[in-house]
Amino acid sequence: MTKFLILILCTLTLKFSYSESYVKAGDSLVWDSENKSYNANGDVEFKNDKFIAFADEMIAQYMENNNKEIFTIVELFENVKIEFKDEIFRGDYAIYTRDNNIIKLIGDVSIQSPSRLLTGNELIADIDNNKRILNSANDGSLVE
């Protein structure tokens, strides 16, 4: 019976909803109230009022405001995919900081929009100013 319950818990998608954001995880979701963080593994999905992100693993820091959890820093690991408006960002690693609304992706990065596909090894996406900086492996090339 115990093995059956563990199997069910491991296969269920865990979901925690907040006023503007949520985290889902296919394997595990660990809440650390002392350090105000979440660790998620397996088919991770994170959504806030700006974008939705998918990855194999996530570590998220939050702060409490009016009894609500507001995610301030979100790190995504492996097979990262971020959907923002009509664009899709992909990379090996991403970090989002709420203070400046910047997403930074590293490693095998791409930006896909309806009219183009750009690739590189680092992307800095300034959400508030609608600006993208894509760096390639060659230090001499830059796309803005």
What do the PLM-derived regions correspond to, one by one?
Residues M1-E144:
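Mature-chain termini and adjacent capping regions
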